[in-house]
Protein backbone atom coordinates (compact mmCIF):
# COMPACT_ATOMS: atom_id res chain seq x y z
CA UNK A 1 0.00 0.00 0.00
CA UNK A 2 2.80 2.44 0.93
CA UNK A 3 4.57 1.69 -2.36
CA UNK A 4 1.50 2.70 -4.35
CA UNK A 5 1.08 5.88 -2.29
CA UNK A 6 4.66 6.90 -3.08
CA UNK A 7 4.15 6.02 -6.75
CA UNK A 8 1.04 8.21 -6.83
CA UNK A 9 2.99 11.19 -5.46
CA UNK A 10 5.72 10.64 -8.05
CA UNK A 11 3.16 10.56 -10.85
CA UNK A 12 1.36 13.64 -9.53
CA UNK A 13 4.54 15.69 -9.44
CA UNK A 14 6.04 14.11 -12.51
CA UNK A 15 9.29 13.53 -10.68
CA UNK A 16 12.27 12.84 -12.91
CA UNK A 17 15.18 14.13 -10.76
CA UNK A 18 14.71 17.64 -11.97
CA UNK A 19 12.34 19.66 -14.10
CA UNK A 20 13.14 22.38 -16.60
CA UNK A 21 11.26 25.56 -15.78
CA UNK A 22 12.02 28.21 -18.41
CA UNK A 23 15.72 28.93 -17.83
CA UNK A 24 15.96 26.99 -14.54
CA UNK A 25 16.47 23.37 -13.56
CA UNK A 26 14.46 22.32 -10.50
CA UNK A 27 16.09 19.59 -8.42
CA UNK A 28 13.82 17.40 -6.31
CA UNK A 29 15.15 16.79 -2.79
CA UNK A 30 13.40 14.39 -0.40
CA UNK A 31 14.13 13.48 3.21
CA UNK A 32 12.34 11.91 6.18
CA UNK A 33 12.77 14.53 8.91
CA UNK A 34 10.27 17.17 10.13
CA UNK A 35 10.73 20.78 9.06
CA UNK A 36 11.66 21.81 12.62
CA UNK A 37 14.75 19.57 12.55
CA UNK A 38 18.22 21.21 12.28
CA UNK A 39 19.07 18.97 9.33
CA UNK A 40 16.11 20.45 7.43
CA UNK A 41 17.47 23.91 8.25
CA UNK A 42 20.80 22.83 6.80
CA UNK A 43 19.01 21.70 3.66
CA UNK A 44 17.30 25.09 3.41
CA UNK A 45 20.78 26.65 3.52
CA UNK A 46 21.83 24.32 0.69
CA UNK A 47 18.77 25.39 -1.30
CA UNK A 48 19.44 29.10 -0.76
CA UNK A 49 23.18 28.85 -1.48
CA UNK A 50 22.69 26.86 -4.69
CA UNK A 51 20.07 29.21 -6.07
CA UNK A 52 22.28 32.21 -5.23
CA UNK A 53 25.44 30.73 -6.77
CA UNK A 54 23.64 29.69 -9.94
CA UNK A 55 21.69 32.97 -10.15
CA UNK A 56 18.49 30.95 -10.19
CA UNK A 57 19.47 28.52 -12.93
CA UNK A 58 19.44 25.68 -10.37
CA UNK A 59 16.55 25.54 -7.93
CA UNK A 60 15.49 22.98 -5.33
CA UNK A 61 12.02 21.70 -4.43
CA UNK A 62 12.03 20.01 -1.02
CA UNK A 63 9.81 17.09 0.06
CA UNK A 64 10.33 16.72 3.85
CA UNK A 65 8.58 14.58 6.48
CA UNK A 66 8.93 11.31 4.58
CA UNK A 67 6.49 12.46 1.89
CA UNK A 68 8.25 10.27 -0.67
CA UNK A 69 8.96 7.35 1.64
CA UNK A 70 11.57 6.01 4.04
CA UNK A 71 15.30 6.63 3.65
CA UNK A 72 15.74 3.34 1.81
CA UNK A 73 12.80 4.08 -0.49
CA UNK A 74 14.10 7.54 -1.36
CA UNK A 75 17.56 6.12 -2.07
CA UNK A 76 15.93 3.85 -4.62
CA UNK A 77 14.28 6.90 -6.20
CA UNK A 78 17.73 8.50 -6.52
CA UNK A 79 19.13 5.37 -8.11
CA UNK A 80 16.48 5.33 -10.83
CA UNK A 81 16.68 9.08 -11.35
CA UNK A 82 13.25 10.08 -10.00
CA UNK A 83 14.71 12.25 -7.21
CA UNK A 84 17.98 14.20 -7.41
CA UNK A 85 19.08 14.73 -3.80
CA UNK A 86 18.41 13.26 -0.36
CA UNK A 87 19.74 13.12 3.18
CA UNK A 88 20.13 9.76 4.90
CA UNK A 89 21.93 8.38 7.91
CA UNK A 90 25.39 6.95 7.30
CA UNK A 91 23.95 3.79 8.87
CA UNK A 92 21.49 3.49 5.98
CA UNK A 93 24.29 4.02 3.46
CA UNK A 94 26.24 1.16 5.02
CA UNK A 95 23.82 -1.20 3.25
CA UNK A 96 25.51 -0.06 0.03
CA UNK A 97 29.02 1.01 1.08
CA UNK A 98 30.56 -1.15 3.86
CA UNK A 99 32.94 1.63 4.92
CA UNK A 100 30.00 3.57 6.34
CA UNK A 101 29.64 0.80 8.94
CA UNK A 102 32.87 1.98 10.55
CA UNK A 103 31.39 5.40 11.34
CA UNK A 104 28.83 3.71 13.60
CA UNK A 105 31.31 1.82 15.81
CA UNK A 106 30.46 2.64 19.44
CA UNK A 107 32.75 5.20 21.06
CA UNK A 108 35.05 5.32 18.01
CA UNK A 109 35.35 9.10 17.98
CA UNK A 110 37.12 10.74 20.92
CA UNK A 111 35.32 14.07 20.51
CA UNK A 112 33.23 16.14 18.11
CA UNK A 113 36.41 17.78 16.83
CA UNK A 114 37.97 14.37 16.17
CA UNK A 115 34.86 13.22 14.33
CA UNK A 116 34.78 16.13 11.89
CA UNK A 117 38.54 16.13 11.36
CA UNK A 118 37.97 12.61 10.05
CA UNK A 119 34.78 13.29 8.09
CA UNK A 120 36.01 16.47 6.41
CA UNK A 121 39.46 15.05 5.72
CA UNK A 122 40.80 12.47 3.31
CA UNK A 123 39.13 9.52 5.05
CA UNK A 124 35.65 11.01 5.04
CA UNK A 125 35.84 12.23 1.45
CA UNK A 126 37.00 8.84 0.21
CA UNK A 127 33.96 7.20 1.81
CA UNK A 128 31.62 9.73 0.18
CA UNK A 129 33.03 8.88 -3.25
CA UNK A 130 32.51 5.14 -2.85
CA UNK A 131 28.75 5.46 -3.19
CA UNK A 132 29.00 6.48 -6.84
CA UNK A 133 29.18 2.87 -8.03
CA UNK A 134 25.70 2.46 -6.51
CA UNK A 135 24.51 5.68 -8.25
CA UNK A 136 24.66 7.56 -4.91
CA UNK A 137 27.32 10.28 -4.80
CA UNK A 138 28.09 11.75 -1.38
CA UNK A 139 28.29 15.55 -1.22
CA UNK A 140 28.99 16.20 2.46
CA UNK A 141 28.26 15.09 6.02
CA UNK A 142 25.74 16.68 8.37
CA UNK A 143 26.12 16.63 12.13
CA UNK A 144 23.70 14.13 13.66
CA UNK A 145 25.15 14.41 17.14
CA UNK A 146 25.53 11.45 19.43
CA UNK A 147 22.91 8.79 19.94
CA UNK A 148 21.65 7.89 23.41
CA UNK A 149 18.99 5.62 24.88
CA UNK A 150 15.48 6.68 25.85
CA UNK A 151 12.82 4.53 27.47
CA UNK A 152 9.18 4.68 28.46
CA UNK A 153 9.04 2.92 31.82
CA UNK A 154 12.47 1.82 33.08
CA UNK A 155 15.45 4.12 33.55
CA UNK A 156 18.79 3.06 32.08
CA UNK A 157 21.59 4.02 34.46
CA UNK A 158 24.02 1.19 33.69
CA UNK A 159 24.20 -1.36 30.85
CA UNK A 160 22.63 -3.92 33.18
CA UNK A 161 19.39 -1.92 33.05
CA UNK A 162 19.06 -2.77 29.36
CA UNK A 163 18.50 -6.45 30.08
CA UNK A 164 15.11 -7.58 28.85
CA UNK A 165 14.30 -4.28 27.13
CA UNK A 166 13.25 -4.12 23.49
CA UNK A 167 15.13 -1.20 21.97
CA UNK A 168 14.26 0.06 18.51
CA UNK A 169 17.26 0.46 16.23
CA UNK A 170 17.80 1.28 12.57
CA UNK A 171 17.95 -1.70 10.25
CA UNK A 172 21.73 -1.70 10.55
CA UNK A 173 23.89 -4.56 11.80
CA UNK A 174 26.23 -2.32 13.79
CA UNK A 175 23.35 -0.81 15.75
CA UNK A 176 21.79 -4.23 16.28
CA UNK A 177 25.05 -5.72 17.55
CA UNK A 178 25.66 -2.77 19.87
CA UNK A 179 22.31 -2.99 21.66
CA UNK A 180 22.56 -6.77 21.95
CA UNK A 181 26.13 -6.52 23.29
CA UNK A 182 24.96 -4.17 26.01
CA UNK A 183 22.27 -6.62 27.07
CA UNK A 184 19.20 -5.22 25.35
CA UNK A 185 17.06 -6.79 22.65
CA UNK A 186 17.61 -4.87 19.41
CA UNK A 187 14.39 -4.40 17.45
CA UNK A 188 14.74 -2.95 13.91
CA UNK A 189 11.75 -0.83 12.96
CA UNK A 190 10.88 2.00 10.57
CA UNK A 191 11.31 5.38 12.22
CA UNK A 192 7.82 6.50 11.29
CA UNK A 193 6.31 3.62 13.29
CA UNK A 194 8.28 4.30 16.46
CA UNK A 195 6.05 6.79 18.29
CA UNK A 196 3.09 4.43 18.28
CA UNK A 197 5.32 1.44 19.07
CA UNK A 198 6.61 3.11 22.25
CA UNK A 199 3.15 4.35 23.15
CA UNK A 200 1.63 0.87 22.81
CA UNK A 201 4.54 -0.95 24.45
CA UNK A 202 5.63 -2.79 21.32
CA UNK A 203 9.14 -1.60 22.21
CA UNK A 204 10.44 -0.27 25.52
CA UNK A 205 12.50 2.49 24.00
CA UNK A 206 14.93 3.54 21.31
CA UNK A 207 18.17 5.41 20.77
CA UNK A 208 18.71 8.69 18.99
CA UNK A 209 20.05 12.21 19.34
CA UNK A 210 18.26 14.94 21.36
CA UNK A 211 16.86 16.96 18.40
CA UNK A 212 15.30 13.85 16.84
CA UNK A 213 14.00 12.73 20.24
CA UNK A 214 12.10 16.02 20.55
CA UNK A 215 11.22 16.91 16.94
CA UNK A 216 9.59 13.51 16.46
CA UNK A 217 7.70 13.96 19.76
CA UNK A 218 9.15 10.79 21.27
CA UNK A 219 9.66 12.72 24.50
CA UNK A 220 5.88 12.64 24.90
CA UNK A 221 5.92 8.85 25.34
CA UNK A 222 9.31 8.44 27.06
CA UNK A 223 10.08 9.16 30.71
CA UNK A 224 13.87 8.77 30.61
CA UNK A 225 16.72 9.93 28.38
CA UNK A 226 20.15 8.48 29.20
CA UNK A 227 23.08 10.47 27.78
CA UNK A 228 25.42 7.54 27.26
CA UNK A 229 26.34 8.93 23.79
CA UNK A 230 27.25 5.50 22.47
CA UNK A 231 27.72 6.42 18.82
CA UNK A 232 28.05 9.46 16.59
CA UNK A 233 26.66 8.40 13.24
CA UNK A 234 26.59 11.36 10.83
CA UNK A 235 24.01 12.10 8.18
CA UNK A 236 25.03 12.19 4.52
CA UNK A 237 23.80 14.55 1.81
CA UNK A 238 23.66 12.59 -1.46
CA UNK A 239 23.03 13.31 -5.10
CA UNK A 240 22.02 10.65 -7.61
CA UNK A 241 24.69 10.05 -10.23
CA UNK A 242 22.02 9.87 -12.94
CA UNK A 243 21.38 13.56 -12.23
CA UNK A 244 24.98 14.52 -11.41
CA UNK A 245 26.21 13.29 -14.78
CA UNK A 246 23.79 15.62 -16.57
CA UNK A 247 25.29 18.70 -14.90
CA UNK A 248 27.97 20.85 -16.46
CA UNK A 249 31.33 21.26 -14.70
CA UNK A 250 30.23 24.68 -13.45
CA UNK A 251 26.90 23.36 -12.16
CA UNK A 252 28.67 20.55 -10.32
CA UNK A 253 30.95 23.10 -8.67
CA UNK A 254 27.96 25.16 -7.54
CA UNK A 255 26.27 22.07 -6.08
CA UNK A 256 29.38 20.97 -4.18
CA UNK A 257 30.14 24.46 -2.85
CA UNK A 258 26.53 24.92 -1.72
CA UNK A 259 26.62 21.53 0.03
CA UNK A 260 29.87 22.38 1.83
CA UNK A 261 28.47 25.73 2.99
CA UNK A 262 25.29 24.08 4.23
CA UNK A 263 27.33 21.53 6.22
CA UNK A 264 29.07 24.30 8.17
CA UNK A 265 25.81 26.16 8.82
CA UNK A 266 24.09 22.95 9.87
CA UNK A 267 26.63 22.40 12.67
CA UNK A 268 25.53 25.69 14.22
CA UNK A 269 21.85 24.80 13.83
CA UNK A 270 22.61 21.43 15.41
CA UNK A 271 24.27 22.82 18.53
CA UNK A 272 21.43 25.29 19.04
CA UNK A 273 18.88 22.52 18.61
CA UNK A 274 20.57 20.17 21.10
CA UNK A 275 20.39 22.82 23.80
CA UNK A 276 16.77 23.71 23.04
CA UNK A 277 15.75 20.05 22.80
CA UNK A 278 17.16 19.20 26.22
CA UNK A 279 15.29 22.14 27.72
CA UNK A 280 12.05 21.02 26.06
CA UNK A 281 12.44 17.44 27.28
CA UNK A 282 13.20 18.55 30.85
CA UNK A 283 10.22 20.91 30.87
CA UNK A 284 8.00 18.01 29.77
CA UNK A 285 9.12 15.95 32.76
CA UNK A 286 11.66 13.68 31.06
CA UNK A 287 14.42 12.66 33.46
CA UNK A 288 17.83 13.32 31.90
CA UNK A 289 20.31 10.75 33.19
CA UNK A 290 24.08 11.31 33.03
CA UNK A 291 25.57 7.81 33.34
CA UNK A 292 29.15 6.62 33.63
CA UNK A 293 29.91 6.25 29.92
CA UNK A 294 32.93 4.05 30.56
CA UNK A 295 30.59 1.24 31.63
CA UNK A 296 28.76 1.37 28.30
CA UNK A 297 32.02 1.67 26.35
CA UNK A 298 33.39 -1.42 28.06
CA UNK A 299 30.25 -3.43 27.28
CA UNK A 300 30.38 -2.44 23.63
CA UNK A 301 34.05 -3.35 22.99
CA UNK A 302 33.01 -6.69 21.54
CA UNK A 303 31.21 -4.87 18.71
CA UNK A 304 34.48 -3.51 17.31
CA UNK A 305 36.30 -6.78 17.93
CA UNK A 306 33.66 -8.78 16.09
CA UNK A 307 33.47 -6.23 13.27
CA UNK A 308 37.19 -6.33 12.40
CA UNK A 309 37.16 -10.11 12.75
CA UNK A 310 34.38 -10.38 10.17
CA UNK A 311 35.76 -7.53 8.03
CA UNK A 312 39.56 -7.61 8.30
CA UNK A 313 39.77 -5.33 5.27
CA UNK A 314 38.33 -2.54 7.46
CA UNK A 315 41.12 -2.73 10.05
CA UNK A 316 43.25 -0.15 8.26
CA UNK A 317 40.34 2.30 8.05
CA UNK A 318 39.56 1.89 11.76
CA UNK A 319 43.20 2.49 12.65
CA UNK A 320 43.35 5.58 10.41
CA UNK A 321 40.36 7.06 12.21
CA UNK A 322 41.79 6.33 15.63
CA UNK A 323 45.09 7.94 14.63
CA UNK A 324 43.54 11.21 13.41
Predicted features along the sequence, with ranges:
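N-terminal secretory/targeting leader peptides
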Residues: 18-114, 123, 131-324
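Short, low-complexity disordered leader/linker segments with a strong preference
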Residues: 1-26
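Thiol/selenol-based redox catalytic cores and closely related redox-interacting motifs
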Residues: 128
Amino acid sequence: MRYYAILLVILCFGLVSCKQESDSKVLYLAHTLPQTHPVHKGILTFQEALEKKSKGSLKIKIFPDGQLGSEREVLELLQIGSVAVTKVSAATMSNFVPEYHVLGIPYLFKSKEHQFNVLEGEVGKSILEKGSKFWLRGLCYYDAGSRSFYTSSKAIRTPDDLKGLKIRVMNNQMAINMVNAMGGSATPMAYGELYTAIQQGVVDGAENNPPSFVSSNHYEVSKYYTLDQHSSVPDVLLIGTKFWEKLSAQERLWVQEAADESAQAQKIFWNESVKASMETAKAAGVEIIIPEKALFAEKSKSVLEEFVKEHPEMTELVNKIKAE
